[in-house]
Amino acid sequence: MSLKIRLARGGAKKRPYYRIVIADARSPRDGRFIEKIGTFNPLLAKDAENRVVLDADKAKAWLEKGAQPTDRVARFLDAAGLMKRDAKNNPKKGEPGEKAKERAKERAEKAAAGSTEDAAAE
């Protein structure tokens, strides 16, 4: 049985509230879980002390048993000092895609061709 430490969504429409739970990886997101170890309220300010409430002892025990945290929960555990999370680096994130590069190249060629025609006409 593969265990995950993940978020289970609760709350109303457009008002999310999450429980941090231990669940079987095959169970639905909001379905059956083994144990609740904390909560996460994304509507609170990032510096609010009760935005993420986590029972560190339970989380540590489940990590020792082999439960794998999801990416978001791994951030919370890293902030709490329970595990080390490597920062991700994507150097190509800000680059435009292939089609955008092609369109920019075509625009540059048209602009260059247009400026040479204007110079030849004068």
From Swiss-Prot:
Q: Which GO terms describe its cellular component?
A: cytoplasm; small ribosomal subunit
> Which parts of the sequence are annotated with region: Disordered?
81-122
Q: Name the Pfam families for this protein.
A: Ribosomal_S16 (PF00886)
Q: Which portions of the chain have biased composition (kind: Basic and acidic residues)?
A: 83-110
Q: Would you kindly state one Gene Ontology biological process term found in this protein's UniProt entry?
A: translation
Record's InterPro entries?
Ribosomal_bS16, Ribosomal_bS16_CS, Ribosomal_bS16_dom_sf
Show the GO MF annotations: structural constituent of ribosome
Q: Which UniProt keywords are present, listed alphabetically?
A: Ribonucleoprotein, Ribosomal protein
The biased composition feature labelled Low complexity covers 111-122
Family to which the UniProt record says this protein belongs: Belongs to the bacterial ribosomal protein bS16 family.
Task: Return the protein name.
Answer: Small ribosomal subunit protein bS16
Q: Which organism is it from?
A: Xanthobacter autotrophicus (strain ATCC BAA-1158 / Py2)
